[in-house]
Regions:
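Helix C-cap/helix->beta junction micro-motif
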Residues: 28, 133, 193-194
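N-terminal small-domain helix-loop-helix segment of the aminotransferase-like
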Residues: 8-97, 104
């Protein structure tokens, strides 16, 4: 099979510098890896024990693809008790991870040519996910001197008639920065004003 049988978007992939960085990192001694948020800590013994008990009790098979009824109810209860928000079971879905959930969300909301705003530094898959969903990534900066907080005026300047959503990454990967309550409120106000996801 030759490469031209692949979808055109995969025939000439962009260079992925992460592979080169990974190879270089492996050649270094005593390097602290901050790339994927995978700590070198052993999982808490209580979690290990509970997982083992669940496996021994027969919880080793596939569950419902959108999440078990017990899980969905736990999510509903959490959002009610913590944030006083009400959700119906049909509004809650489980995914295999945050990247999977993000990609499914982008597929659900993005039409070809829609612009999706992401703030940099950003988790490297975000740009690709937006493009694979048919969207156009619009990258805006955040700055170390501001604690990597998203500035409302910079966000406003990036919005166009094609803007569909703003990706919020807090705590941020890779910086670890957490948006302040004030920053979140400004983003929410702008999103409501412009009818953005």
């Amino acid at each position: 099979m030759n490469r031209y049988n692949l979808a055109k978007k995969y025939q000439e992939p962009e260079e992925n510098i992460m592979m080169d960085i990974g190879a270089l990192a492996k050649s270094q001694e005593e390097l602290i890896d901050l790339s994927i948020g995978d700590p070198d800590l052993i999982t808490d013994e209580r979690i290990i024990e509970q997982a083992a008990q669940d496996a021994k009790a027969g919880h080793t098979r596939y569950t419902a693809s959108d999440g078990s009824a017990a899980f969905i109810q736990t999510v509903i209860d959490h959002y009610k008790s913590r944030y006083d928000l009400d959700f119906a079971a049909k509004q809650v879905r489980a995914t295999v991870g945050a990247m999977h959930g993000m990609y499914l969300t982008l597929l659900a909301i993005t039409d070809p040519g829609d612009e999706i705003i992401i703030h940099e530094p950003y988790f490297s898959p975000y740009k690709d996910q937006i493009e694979l969903a048919g969207g156009i990534p619009v990258v805006i900066p955040t700055y170390e001197k501001d604690g990597f907080q998203l500035e409302a005026d910079i966000l406003e300047q990036a919005i166009s008639k094609k803007t569909k959503a703003v990706v919020i990454n807090s705590p941020n990967n890779p910086t670890g920065a957490v948006f302040s309550e004030e920053t979140f409120q400004k983003i929410a106000d702008i999103a409501i004003q412009h009818d953005l996801f």
